[in-house]
Amino acid sequence: MKKRLIWLLPVLVGFLVFVLFQTVFLLGYVPSESMEPTLREGSMILGTRIYRELNNGDIVVFEHNGELFVKRIAAGPGEEINVEGKTYHVPPNAYFVLGDNSENSFDSRYWENPYVSEDKIIAKIVIPS
């Protein structure tokens, strides 16, 4: 009986960790310098896939045109934001995102559709390293 438990416990723990990272948490890294100095390129981040709400200032991981991005929410649904002399009106269920390193960030300012749909947000960052 003890021999069975010796190998069963690590398998169960490994399975539980796998399930948690597929459903609740996101462990990743920052792919570029667009979020510096807040998040350094290559630094590890921990996000949660389960959150109550998103607010301006939150850092999120999202999918845009088949790529994953890490950016900060600058404006939320129904808000208006003026960036570099241009006014944006954020539609319902969408967000306007910017990188902290504005000179080195490919973000909402440059996209044909500058808004990130709520359903494209994968996680809210809770622990940057």
Spans of model-derived segments:
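Extended hydrophobic leader/signal-anchor segments used for secretion and membrane insertion
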Residues: M1-S129
